[in-house]
Structure formats: structure tokens, C-alpha cells
Amino acid sequence: MSNKKKVILGMSGGVDSSVCAYLLLKQGYEVEGLFMRNWDSMLNNDFLGNENISQDICPQEQDYQDALEVANKLGIKLHRVDFVNEYWNDVFKTFISEYEAGRTPNPDILCNKYIKFKAFSDYAFNNLGADYIAMGHYAKVTDGRLYRAKDQNKDQTYFLAQLSHEQLKRVLMPLAEFSSKEEVRKIAQEQDLITASKKDSTGICFIGERKFTKFLQNYIPMQPGDIVDIRTNKKLGKHEGCFYYTIGQRKGLNLGGQAEPYYVCGHDVKKNILYVAPSSDLSYLTSDALLATGLTLNHDDFDHNNLSAKFRYRQQDIPVTIELLPNNTIKVYYPSESQAVTPGQQVVLYEGQKCLGGAVIEKIYYKGSEKTYL
């Protein structure tokens, strides 16, 4: 009987997880792949905005075929599991209810917390006898603690910050030390893997590319209302539904005849009003503090005087100070100010290379006053 440690690898049919399979084999693990099916367009009424609905083979099925071909090439077993119900209940219902409340959720964060590192890991450990699970994320995990990847451009710790130390204790991230995606593709080419030049997946986690406003209309009916200048309270036009617009958005407002472009600065969901402000006045987007809830901290030990944060993916870190409050609540102060910090999104805290954790943004402040129009 083999004394090799068994790793169950999330295989998506993309180049990252394909190369992970090769690397883990090379490192001496017993490797098996697990492909997740998390979305069913027919069952989930996903018709509007879905350009794949009439294709002979849906992208998800093509991904499975690619993962299978890679698994066969590397001589490993590929399992397939269906988490459509879990995704709907734990990720998508929250996603929709947040939009209905006029907030901007991040499905990738929910997806990692409840699917990849909960449903997937439970299945791998309980059904497939895994010692470890592995994922093709660009992030570093050491002893269950989360750190930034070497490739800062691809670093995905922002999406993993809600994971607990417990969830990460038996996780391997083989791509942590790569300097660029090109290095990963080069290995795939050298090993003649079918996914070597496959494009990165984009769009909503496990759902894919959609025409977003149309896609939301499958689940949230259109509710046209007034677009109002927040400074003058003057009606400037009509919107299709508050839920379809995000804070800071400039395109798609159809406000012709104005002296300058406008941007979305807030909404009143109950009154169905979309608030806008002119581009020359960014004060309505600016904030210097926030309150966030549901804080998960992955590191216990950190220097309170050397913290930075991101409020959205790929944003440059900005220096912050924090105030830890009861009930996993946190106040974050950023005196250098930031724009378009949005309720429903996540604040992620860092100390150098350490990703300390994250929380969901609830309230935004500027010069001591809450911005209630968000």
C-alpha cells in the first residue's frame, strides 16, 4: 500500500489547475482530480444575457472534457461532483438578495468560502480519502496561514481572505511561487497539455460570461425609476432598476444634454431613486473610514501599526488603522482617502506579505459622517 499523501485537486479545465496536477505529481503526491459542476442554466432559469444557451456543447461541458484529457495525459483519476444546490443556496441566493438591497456583492469570495473550501473540501476529505486538497489559486498557504503570491499581478488573496485558519490547514497552493502566468503556460506547453493556450475564465464564479444587466433580469424584475442629481434633487432621466448600477459607474446612464458626464453616487432602493453627481465633484465618492462585519482573521499575530487594505481586487494597498469591535465587527480608517468604496464589497487587511483576513463593508464615512445615500 502506498504511503504517499493523497491530494484531491480542484480541476476546472483551465491551465492553472492542469499545471498544478503536474507539479503535485512531480512533488511525489498521489493526485486525483475533482471537477465541480455548480451551475445548471436550465434549472436556474439562466436565459437572458446567456449567449451560450443555444450552443451544442456548453462551456462547462467543454471544461470537463479538457480536464479529463489532461487527467488522462497525466495518468490520474478525475472525479466529477455536482454542487448545483449548494451553489444556489449558499452563494447565488445571497448574491441576488445583496443586489436587491442595493449592495454590490462579490460572488468569488462567497464561492471560495462555501463551495471550494467547504463543499469541495468536505467531499474530498469525507468521500475521497484526501490528506490534502489543492487549488490553482495564486496565493501562498503556510501552516494554514495565508500570504500573497509571488506574482503580485495575479495574487488572489483578496478572494480568499474570508477563509479561516481551520479551512486552510490542509490546503496546498502549488502556484504560489511563480513569477508570472507565462511561466505556468510554459510548463503546460512543455508537457503538451491541451489547456496550455486556453484563455483564462472570466465572468461570474462558476457561471461565466454573461451580459450582466440582462442576466440579473432573470432574477430581479426591471423597476424603472428616476435618476436624480444628488446636489439639486433635480430629475435628469430614467433608470431601468437601481440594482443594475454600481457606485462610481459612468457608462450606460443615457443622460444626454448635460454640461458634463455624471457618475452613480448612490441610491434609495425603497423610493427607487438612482442618485448621480457630476464628474467634476468627486466628494460623493470619497470616504476615509468604514464599518465592516463578519470579520474572519487568518493570522492572530500582527503589527497594528503596519497595516494596509484593499477594498476591491487589483486595487493598490492603502495604509489603514483598525479598531476591532465586538461581534466580529471592525472599523477601518484610511486618512489618505479612497473613492467608490461600496457596501457589500469586502475590505481585506494585509501586513506586508501576510493576508490577515477580510470583512464585508456595511457603512462608509467621510470626515466623521456616514454616507447614508449609498
UniProtKB/Swiss-Prot annotation:
Catalytic site: C111 (nucleophile), C205 (cysteine persulfide intermediate)
Reaction equations catalysed: S-sulfanyl-L-cysteinyl-[protein] + uridine(34) in tRNA + AH2 + ATP = 2-thiouridine(34) in tRNA + L-cysteinyl-[protein] + A + AMP + diphosphate + H(+)
Enzyme class, spelled out: transferase
Annotated residues for binding of ATP: G10, M11, S12, G13, G14, V15, D16, S17, M36, G136
SUPFAM superfamilies linked to this entry: Adenine nucleotide alpha hydrolases-like
Stored Pfam families: tRNA_Me_trans, tRNA_Me_trans_C, tRNA_Me_trans_M
EC number, UniProt record: 2.8.1.13
Chief location bin: cytoplasm
Family named by the database record: Belongs to the MnmA/TRMU family.
Full protein name: tRNA-specific 2-thiouridylase MnmA
Protein species of origin: Mycoplasmopsis agalactiae (strain NCTC 10123 / CIP 59.7 / PG2)
Gene name of the record: mnmA
